[in-house]
Amino acid sequence: MITFQNVNKHYGDFHVLKQINLQIEKGEVVVIIGPSGSGKSTLLRCINRLESINEGVLTVNGTAINDRKTDINQVRQNIGMVFQHFHLYPHKTVLQNIMLAPVKVLRQSPEQAKETARYYLEKVGIPDKADAYPSQLSGGQQQRVAIARGLAMKPEVMLFDEPTSALDPEMIGEVLDVMKTLAKEGMTMVVVTHEMGFAKEVADRIVFIDEGKILEEAVPAEFYANPKEERARLFLSRILNH
């Protein structure tokens, strides 16, 4: 479904992603972990061309993302993204935030979009917040609205870029619970996170990246019990003993 072939990304002289080769299948939950500044968020953001690549080929459902002829807006309709900071419109209600893209992009009628928005608010556990404004919500609730907004476009894949790192500790669980439900329902998910418990429980595969390179890929049980790379062992010992 998503394929990186010899992908490289530079910021000027800084080589951010180095020869990335990665295949993500439909229905798979892939968690990308690694130290800060390792390139994991950049890798994620290349999937919907929020970041462009300099070399190599990146395809989503057979469409080359980096081809100039590709209609990236068409591709993005099938890719939901949830950011660290929620990016909700402060002057629109929760319902209006979720309805916006289905009406503008999918050309749904307002009635249909409203029904879709209410359905996904129910799914993320906050149906009673439809008429609230973002400022009236906790961080966890805002992030759940952001997830509902992504789902309302009925994407084929959801990207999560450190979705819990801006949240207070007691709100992290409510967001992870929603993500666990999505994973169980078969949503293709690519997640950048420091939530090791979530990765262990939900991931089909863990990808460890450091200094722009994929150093290790493994199923969680194997990765946690016996990481092959010394750098991965060091990272895990620091994170798990923190």
UniProtKB/Swiss-Prot annotation:
Membrane topology designation: Peripheral membrane protein
Protein's UniProt keywords contain Transport: yes
Binding site for ATP: 34-41
InterPro entries named in the record: AAA+_ATPase (IPR003593), ABC_ATPase_HisP-typ (IPR030679), ABC_transporter-like_ATP-bd (IPR003439), ABC_transporter-like_CS (IPR017871), MetN_ABC_transporter-like (IPR050086), P-loop_NTPase (IPR027417)
Keywords of this entry: Amino-acid transport, ATP-binding, Cell membrane, Membrane, Nucleotide-binding, Translocase, Transport
SMART domains attached to this UniProt entry: AAA
Name recorded for this polypeptide: Glutamine transport ATP-binding protein GlnQ
Organism annotation: Bacillus subtilis (strain 168)
